[in-house]
Each structure stands twice: as structure tokens, then as C-alpha cells.
Amino acid sequence: RFAAVALAVFFLCCKKVRLQEKLLSVGLLAFFLLSFLFRTLDYYWHGGHFPNMLPYRFSFLFSFVLIVMAYRAWTLLDCFRKRYLFVILPVCLGIILCGLGLEGSLRRMLLSALALAIVCLALVLYRPERRRQLLSMALLFAVIGAEMVCSIAMGVAKVSLTSRSSYPRE
């Protein structure tokens, strides 16, 4: 998550990205966030009725826009300046601090801060030289892979699995 968020913030800082593209991306993210907060927008998203089982079916679009922003920033990584960390770090730390008070939040916050530190290290180490590029990419891919594994593990632990014996018989 933090690799995508950090790169998305870099996308907003990068001067090579047109203002129109930045405004459209931020506008979409804001619209999706408002749709999560206000049931009326959720009602319109679902064709004029409130869903019974799966509210916020459109929530994957938020992640998709964030990933598109991160990919666009990835393609412009040669433009990265260390001063962008003064924007990236507070934004990401603010997101981490939003988890205060949640169950098991300290462990999650520490792991998130560690992931953020590794992402920032990878961004600082990135240079057009081949060896530095490979090191930076390896660090970013390691963080992204670890975040994916943790998300999958937490999702499976939260929802749990159904055994074959629990299936209805015909």
C-alpha cells in the first residue's frame, strides 16, 4: 500500500505531469472517498437501490486510480528529487496515524512505518545507473510483495476458510 501511496504523492509533486492529469486523478480519488462516506452516492452507484450483501462494490476503482498514479510516477522516477520526501513522508505518516486506537494498531503502525522507510530508501537510492536502478527496484518489489502477502494473510484470517464438509449436500 505505501509503495503505491508514496509513488502517487510523487506523481502529484512531479513537474513533468500535467496539471490536468493531476487534477483529474485527485478529483476521482476525492469522488470515491465521498462515495464511501455518503450513502446517497453509494445508492446512485448501485443503480438506485442499497445493496444487501456487498456495499461499495466500486471500491476497487479507488485502488485502481491510485495504482495508475503510482505507475505513472514509476515511469518518471528519473525526475525524483530528495526534497519530494518532505511531502511524501508527512502524507504517509498521516495515513499511518489514522490507525491509532484500532485493535492491534501499534504492530500494524510499526510494520507500516518500516515499509514506508524501505520505500523512501528505495526512492533515495534510485539513480539512472543500472546497478542503483536494480537495487531500488528490488527494494520496492520486496516491499510490494511483503505488503501483498500480509494483506492476503490478514484477509484470510479475518474471513477464514470454509471446509468441504460445510458445503450443502445435493
Each model region followed by its residue ranges:
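Secondary-structure junction/capping motif
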Residues: 1, 169-170
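Contiguous transmembrane helix-bundle modules in multi-pass membrane proteins
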Residues: 26-40, 49-169
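Hydrophobic, aromatic-rich transmembrane alpha-helices
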Residues: 1-30, 119-127
